[in-house]
Curated annotation (Swiss-Prot):
The protein's Enzyme Commission number: 2.4.1.21
HAMAP family for the chain: Glycogen_synth (MF_00484)
Domain of life the protein comes from: Archaea
UniProt GO molecular function: alpha-1,4-glucan glucosyltransferase (ADP-glucose donor) activity; alpha-1,4-glucan glucosyltransferase (UDP-glucose donor) activity
Pathway participation: Glycan biosynthesis; glycogen biosynthesis
Pfam families: Glyco_transf_5 (PF08323), Glycos_transf_1 (PF00534)
Keyword list, A-Z: Glycogen biosynthesis, Glycosyltransferase, Transferase
Gene: glgA
Cited function: Synthesizes alpha-1,4-glucan chains using ADP-glucose.
Protein name stated in the entry: Probable glycogen synthase
């Protein structure tokens, strides 16, 4: 099968959020047995940092003006997938999400693909590709699919063939098959009026995103942190860190937590991080507040964008009360909405010693937060799929999350009543139903009760199932240690691109699009 993928952003060249990671990984794993090429734009001239061949020029007309693009051929630096990159200096420097870019991108795509033979399917991703998908189907008569990574972002209104609709609606209307990124999210949105209207009984399903387990292998954490700092910062120079497996995570993770966060190794690292050239996909990091404690003081981490979707209003309401009731610490690594950033800075400064706010975008630091945290929180109001929970679990860190979308599909929840239904040997996190203060506080307290605070009570039924009674949170047989192991193996077996059924399902989606396009009456 010859597959063309339209990619708004791609990790590590230009990446914002999880979409860039999927655009790196999906082509990599689809290319086994298929011919795959990715079409993208030269955002901020970043592709000039790669070896490339300038193969031709394409001129398109936008609002009466002729704009000429160089067409660059290169390969992805880590996956080897073929990339076709459209480059014009003026357009390159527009914001990554500027709709003008994607109006022009649509014409670039159809002009380029018009000379490419034997294309089986064109796969577009999110609103940015909606117009391109419409034109590939309508003008080039090619089978097309559209993957909705976050339906909350629909793009600007645009006119096409006398109809006015958003970029996303246009893509849904013209695509031969449509999917979103988890089965539960597909169920949540399938009856939204605009989706129902434009789907018009076409195939619609949810296919889970995955992660490349080789990228998030805790045995490679030092190598990963070095690579992600352009080999300018070696984490071993700042604090204790060691590769670890699922089997020894209960020994290594608490030492990373204590050394980097409670003893302060992270502060010197951030100071040096802010001095190096990081490229367009990373930023300097501001430090506000701080955390201290002993090795058994629970540390709860957050990694993600500072947006309303991620549940910040709930966290701002609940965390002060949680700090009053419990001896716990929080570390945040986030960047985004300025108002959220300011509220978080103020919260951290008010609770210095108990909250550390790292304001910025840094992939090495995200690995560190995953590895050093006892739990990761994701109180999202909605979550189409989510990659953070998979990345956290790959680092053997259980997740406290809202029971929604992809979080529901990827986290195996600790039973609400472990006395009667102890499932510590299977659970990878805690799910709560309502993402408000009460729900979130229940989730955090349920997690901490059964992994830190109630070890004596746990012994009553842990002995029943023939485990030695744990005395400390990180004993080999403790609930937390068991859940750490569960997390890694769950990701490896069920959520990695290598082993999950998602690649097979994408091939099925493409086959359905081809059938719909050519064979449906």
């Amino acid at each position: 099968m010859k597959i063309v993928i339209l990619a708004p952003t791609i990790t590590p060249i230009v990446s914002y959020g999880g979409l860039g990671d999927v655009m790196r990984d999906l082509p990599k794993f689809l290319k086994k047995g298929n011919e795959v090429v990715v079409l993208t734009l030269n955002h901020y001239n970043r592709y000039f940092t790669l070896p490339y061949e300038d193969i031709k020029k394409i001129t398109v007309i936008y609002k009466g003006a002729k704009i000429t693009f160089d067409v660059l051929r290169t390969k992805h630096p880590t996956t080897g997938v073929d990339l076709i990159v459209f480059s014009n200096e003026s357009v390159n420097n527009l914001n990554v999400w500027d709709p003008i870019k994607y109006e022009i991108f649509a014409d670039l795509v159809i002009t380029y693909l018009d000379e490419v033979k034997d294309i089986d399917v064109v796969s577009g991703h999110d609103w940015m590709c909606g117009l391109a998908i419409a034109k590939c189907n309508d003008i080039l008569d090619l089978p097309t699919t559209l993957t909705i990574h976050n339906e909350a972002f629909k793009g600007e209104m645009i006119e096409y063939k006398g109809e006015v609709m958003t970029f996303l609606e246009l893509g849904i209307k013209y695509a031969d098959a449509v999917n979103t990124v988890s089965p539960s999210h597909a169920e949540e949105i399938k009856n939204y009026p605009y989706i129902k209207k434009y789907l018009n009984n076409k195939p619609f399903c949810g296919i889970l995103n995955g992660i490349d387990i080789d990228e998030y292998d805790p045995m490679k954490i030092i190598e990963r942190m070095c690579n992600l700092s352009n080999n300018k910062l070696d984490p071993r120079n700042y604090a204790y860190i060691s590769p670890y497996s699922a089997e020894d995570s209960h020994n290594i993770k608490p030492k990373i937590k204590y050394s980097w966060f409670y003893r302060g190794g992270v502060y010197e690292y951030v100071e040096d991080w802010n001095k190096i050239d990081k490229g367009i996909s990373a930023t300097d990091v501001e430090v506000h507040g701080g955390v201290d404690g002993d090795i058994e003081t629970p540390l709860i981490g957050f990694v993600g964008r500072a947006t309303h979707q991620k549940g910040f209003n709930t966290m701002f309401e609940a965390i002060p009360e949680l700090l009053e009731k419990h001896d716990i610490r929080f570390v945040f690594l986030t960047k985004g909405d300025r108002d959220i950033e300011e509220r978080l800075k103020n919260l951290a400064n008010e609770h210095d010693g108990r909250i550390l706010a790292l304001i910025g975008y840094s992939l090495p630091l995200s690995s560190l937060v995953f590895a050093g945290s006892d739990w990761i929180i994701m109180p999202s109001y909605w979550e189409p799929c989510g990659l953070v929970q998979m990345e956290a679990m790959a680092y053997c860190t259980p997740v406290i999350a809202t029971e929604t979308g992809g979080l529901k599909d990827t986290i195996i929840p600790l039973h609400p009543n472990p006395y009667e239904h102890p499932n510590f040997d299977k659970a990878t996190g805690v799910l709560f139903k309502v993402p408000d203060k009460v729900g979130f506080m229940w989730g955090v307290e349920h997690a901490l009760n059964w992994t830190f605070y109630k070890l004596n009570e746990i012994c009553m039924f842990m002995q029943y199932i023939r485990y030695k009674c744990p005395k400390h949170p990180y004993d080999e047989n403790s609930p937390l240690s068991m859940m750490m192991k569960n997390c890694y193996y769950h990701v490896f077996r069920n959520l990695s691109w290598q082993n999950s059924p998602s690649i097979r399902k994408y091939k099925g989606l493409f086959g359905g699009a081809i059938y719909n396009h050519y064979l449906q009456p």
